Design a protein with these regions (language model features):
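Hydrophobic alpha-helical segments, chiefly the membrane-spanning helices
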Residues: 302-304
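Signature of Asx- and small-polar-rich beta-strand/turn repeats characteristic
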Residues: 1-290, 294, 298
Length: 304
């Protein structure tokens, strides 16, 4: 390896930059799926003279638009108007892509790294579950953490890092800091594979999802009225090499606390990944406790 690749400021190869950023506990942002907001409405049918009490929009593909497939990532249930029988899903957030499930069977006798095999995985949609064996139906949800503070031997967490070729890797605890997975357990990874920014600015959608009421009746797609409340936006490419080199040392220097104006800016950008840039300033005379944050997003500017 060339000497310049051993240092973050001068490194140019992404895998080398990512490995150096790991030393600063920095996880580069993955590709991000475009998202839109829909309103869905349909007329339910009476059963024995009464309308169903509620209706559920099932997780999975719900719409097509702009040559893409759009999904909801969890079941959504709303109540049915008992007088009219109309059910309304007022703010349905949909994301572009395909939902993928990938499983590993735990083998502690070999060094096992749990890789997400898809390069275009939106890591913000990642759900990690562990079940006792292949035939088990119940599973435990594990949460991502980036610090060992307050973790016990039984805390169900995982640690995330970008690996080679922009494919992310998951590691579990060691029964000291976080629970370790056991032989024969099954690790289930669910995430969205997306086209990123290509899915932006789509405003016309056709419903393809599944809606089921409390009596078990499934409604045809043609019976659903669909209205676009917000066209698709916020799809983005994975974080660039230059962005990683800039953000990693600043994220590390903040150390999860906001003291300086730069700390506020870095932490805010980490939380609000739709921000193009963040500027924080404050410390004005007689108002030392006030920090102003100006955040131009990809669609508008937010100040608070």
């Amino acid at each position: 390896m060339a000497l310049n690749e051993a240092f973050l400021p001068s490194s140019t190869v992404r895998d080398n930059v990512v490995n150096l950023a790991k030393l600063l506990n920095y996880v580069p942002r993955s590709i991000q799926a475009a998202k839109a907001c829909l309103k869905l409405e349909l007329q339910t049918n009476q059963v024995n003279g009464a309308y169903p009490s509620n209706i559920t929009l099932k997780k999975g593909p719900v719409a097509t638009g702009g040559n893409f497939v759009w999904n909801v990532l969890a079941d959504t249930t709303v109540e049915v108007n008992t007088s009219t029988g109309i059910a309304t899903f007022d703010k349905v957030s949909i994301k572009e892509g395909s939902i993928v499930n990938f499983q590993y069977i735990v083998n502690t006798f070999a060094k096992q790294i749990y890789k997400i095999p898809s390069e275009d995985a939106d890591i913000s949609t990642l759900a990690v579950r562990v079940k006792a064996n292949e035939s088990a139906t119940a599973s435990d949800l594990y949460n991502q953490v980036d610090t060992v503070t307050n973790l016990t031997a039984t805390t169900r967490v995982y640690f995330l890092a970008e690996g080679e070729d922009m494919r992310y890797e998951i590691r579990f605890g060691d029964d000291s800091v976080g629970r370790a997975v056991k032989d024969g357990e099954v690790v289930d990874l669910e995430y969205l594979v997306t086209s990123g920014p290509d899915g932006n600015q789509v405003g016309t959608f056709s419903f393809i999802g599944k809606i089921e009421d409390s009596t078990g009746k499934v409604y045809p797609t043609a019976s659903v009225n669909i209205v676009t409340k917000q066209k698709s936006q916020q799809g983005d490419k994975a974080e660039s090499v230059e962005s990683i080199k800039y953000n990693a040392p600043r994220y590390y220097s903040a150390q999860y606390r906001a003291v300086t104006a730069q700390d506020y800016a870095i932490i805010t950008k980490n939380i609000y990944d739709n921000a193009d840039s963040v500027v924080a300033y404050g410390g004005d005379a007689l108002n030392l406790s006030l920090i102003h944050i100006s955040e131009p997003t990809r669609q508008a500017e937010i100040s608070y």
